[in-house]
A protein has these predicted regions:
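Transmembrane beta-barrel domains of Gram-negative outer membranes and organellar outer membranes
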Residues: 21-137, 142-149, 159-161, 180-186, ...
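Acidic surface patches and DE-rich sequence motifs
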Residues: 193, 205
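Short, solvent-exposed amphipathic alpha-helical segments in soluble enzyme
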Residues: 206-207, 228-230
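A mid-sequence, solvent-exposed acidic-amphipathic segment
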Residues: 153-187, 191
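Cleavable N-terminal export/targeting peptides
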Residues: 1-27, 233
Length: 233
């Protein structure tokens, strides 16, 4: 019980962000959902995540690694590999295979003073490349507000439309992020990802390294690291 109380206290303190990424999949977003934010033109991201049992359709702890690049601030593409635990020809069990998937995101409408930004995206679209556990098309809206001076509060809402019967992403999702003006490199977030609730935080170190950690329904903990830089200036 004390551990859960401390986690809850940490999560409530932690709802903040100008660092923008759907951390678990290597895309722009919150912890495990996309947002309609976009990175700056020419931004490259690469990294890896620990994904415990319960975060994926698999019944084992695993992880992924990814690369991501944003073109012209309206088009973003990423490619990721999720490690699969299998049995090798000699009977040894280990992470010998990978589930490969990609994401493409297009922003037809940038956020304005009175309207949200809009992004349309697709995850894992190619049916001939595997089981397509993350196969979805989605639309998402994000609107940010300035509160208490220059603090930033952002609200996100969206909907997943699965493109196959195996997809683990389906239905509505949404989240909130809060970024204090005194330290924009710190991020605290809470979200519903269509299957469960996630609460956590992220921070950027030395301008290029971002770390994140979050809990899924207070049952497991996920985290990761990523490197980001601008290839075009």
């Amino acid at each position: 019980m004390p551990i859960k109380r401390y986690l809850l206290l940490f999560s409530l303190i932690s709802c903040c962000i100008t660092i923008r990424a759907q951390y678990s999949m290597g895309n722009t977003g919150l912890l495990n959902i996309p947002t309609a934010d976009m990175q700056e033109t020419g931004t490259f991201m690469g990294g890896g995540n620990y994904l415990p049992n319960g975060m994926t359709p698999f019944n084992f702890n695993t992880g992924n690694y990814f690369i991501n690049i944003t073109f012209l601030s309206i088009l973003e593409m990423s490619y990721r590999c999720t490690l699969l635990k299998t049995t090798r020809y000699d009977g040894k069990k280990g992470y010998f295979q990978q589930d490969r998937s990609m994401t493409a995101r297009l922003r037809p409408l940038k956020e304005g003073r009175f309207h949200p930004s809009v992004v349309i995206g697709v995850d894992d679209p190619f049916k001939n490349t595997g089981n397509n556990y993350f196969g979805t098309v989605y639309g998402v809206l994000t609107k940010s507000f300035s509160i208490a001076g220059r603090d930033r509060l952002a609200l996100t809402a969206g909907y997943y439309i699965p493109i196959n019967d195996r997809s683990i992403q389906k239905g509505p999702f949404g989240g909130i992020s809060y970024s204090p003006a005194f330290y924009r490199e710190m991020a605290f977030m809470a979200e519903y990802d269509s299957d469960g609730f996630n609460i956590g935080a992220a921070t950027r170190l030395w301008k290029h390294i971002s770390l994140h950690i979050f809990t899924r329904d207070f049952k497991c903990v996920s985290g990761g690291i990523r490197y980001e830089c601008k290839l075009l200036h």
